[in-house]
Swiss-Prot record:
GO biological process, one term: tRNA processing
InterPro entries from the UniProt entry: ExoRNase_PH_dom1, ExoRNase_PH_dom2, ExoRNase_PH_dom2_sf, PNPase/RNase_PH_dom_sf, Ribosomal_Su5_D2-typ_SF, RNase_PH, RNase_PH_bac-type, RNase_PH_CS
Binding site residues for phosphate: 89, 127-129
Summary of the function given for this chain in its UniProt record: Phosphorolytic 3'-5' exoribonuclease that plays an important role in tRNA 3'-end maturation. Removes nucleotide residues following the 3'-CCA terminus of tRNAs; can also add nucleotides to the ends of RNA molecules by using nucleoside diphosphates as substrates, but this may not be physiologically important. Probably plays a role in initiation of 16S rRNA degradation (leading to ribosome degradation) during starvation.
Native source species: Neisseria meningitidis serogroup B (strain ATCC BAA-335 / MC58)
Transferase listed as a keyword: yes
Enzyme Commission designation: 2.7.7.56
Domain of life: Bacteria
A GO molecular-function descriptor: 3'-5'-RNA exonuclease activity
Family as reported in the entry's similarity comment: Belongs to the RNase PH family.
Protein known as: Ribonuclease PH
One Pfam match: RNase_PH_C
Enzyme class, broadest EC rank: transferase
Keywords annotated in UniProt: Nucleotidyltransferase, RNA-binding, rRNA processing, Transferase, tRNA processing, tRNA-binding
C-alpha cells in the first residue's frame, strides 16, 4: 500500500487552531476551541462546595463532564439523556479531562471548593477529547484568575499549563493531529496529554490495524510534543487576550 500523503497540511502540522476566550457570559471561565473543523465549548464553574469525600480536608477538586450535540456529527446522534445513561466513551473522556487538569492544580491552594468543567462538542471532526483538554485548561485558568483577582485566593494554584493532541500512523506515515477520516482509517492512534514542562500525564494508544513498535511510539511522542508546544502557545495567546 502506498504511503499516505496529506493534501492540506504537512504530516507534522496541526490543523488551524483558534481559541476564543470568554465565549459564554454566564460562567466563571469559558472558551471556544476550534481545531480545524472540530469545535468545542469549554466552561469552568466555581462551586463553593466539595464532594463528600473531601469535606473538612481543606483541599479542592476539579472534575469534568463531556458531551456531544446531536448535530455535531454527520448523522444525528441520540442524546444520552434520551437514552437514560452515558456511554462508556463519554465516561472515559470526561474522566480523562478531569485527571489531566487535576494533575496541574495544587488542590490545597485551591481551598475547599471545586471547579466544574463542561466540554460540549458542537462540531466533531476527530480529536474531540484532546481539543476538550486543551480548551478546558483555558477555561480553568480564567476561572482561577477570577478567584485570585477577587481576593478569594492569595495565589494561583495552577502549577503549569497542560494541553493534548492526537498522533497516529496512517499507511505507515506518522501524523500529527488526526482529523476524522485519518482517525477512522489509521494503523494506530495515540492521544497524548503533556504539561508545559514536557511531563506526560497520559498516553492512550491503540493499534487499530497494525501493532506499533517502541521506536514508533517514541517518534509519535516526539511528534505530539511538537504539536503540544504550539497548542500551549495558542493557550497563552488566548489568555493574554482574555
Amino acid at each position: 500500500m502506498p504511503d499516505y500523503i496529506r493534501i492540506s497540511r504537512a504530516a507534522d502540522s496541526l490543523r488551524d487552531i483558534k481559541i476564543t476566550p470568554h465565549f459564554l457570559p454566564h460562567t466563571d471561565g469559558s472558551c471556544l476551541i476550534e481545531c480545524g473543523n472540530t469545535k468545542v465549548i469549554c466552561t469552568a464553574s466555581i462551586d463553593e462546595n466539595v464532594p463528600p469525600f473531601l469535606r473538612g480536608k481543606n483541599q479542592g477538586w476539579v472534575t469534568a463532564e463531556y458531551g456531544m450535540l446531536p448535530a455535531s456529527t454527520a448523522s444525528r446522534m441520540l442524546r444520552e439523556a434520551s437514552a437514560g445513561k452515558q456511554s462508556g466513551r463519554t465516561q472515559e473522556i470526561q474522566r480523562l479531562i478531569g485527571r489531566s487538569l487535576r494533575a496541574v492544580v495544587d488542590m490545597e491552594k485551591l481551598g475547599e471548593r471545586q471547579i466544574l468543567i463542561d466540554c460540549d462538542v458542537i462540531q466533531a471532526d476527530g480529536g474531540t477529547r484532546t481539543a476538550s483538554i486543551t480548551g478546558a485548561f483555558v477555561a480553568l485558568q480564567i476561572a482561577v484568575g477570577k478567584l485570585v483577582s477577587d481576593g478569594i485566593l492569595s495565589e494561583n494554584p495552577i502549577r503549569e499549563a497542560v494541553a493534548a493532541v492526537s498522533v497516529g500512523v496512517v499507511n505507515g506515515v506518522p501524523l500529527l493531529d488526526l482529523d476524522y477520516p485519518e482517525d477512522s482509517g489509521c494503523d494506530s492512534d495515540v492521544n497524548i496529554v503533556m504539561t508545559a514542562s514536557g511531563k506526560i500525564i497520559e498516553i492512550q494508544g491503540t493499534a487499530e490495524d497494525a501493532p506499533f513498535s517502541l521506536d514508533e511510539l517514541g517518534k509519535l511522542v516526539a511528534l505530539a510534543q511538537k504539536g503540544i508546544g504550539e497548542l500551549l502557545q495558542h493557550q497563552q495567546n488566548a489568555l493574554s487576550a482574555a
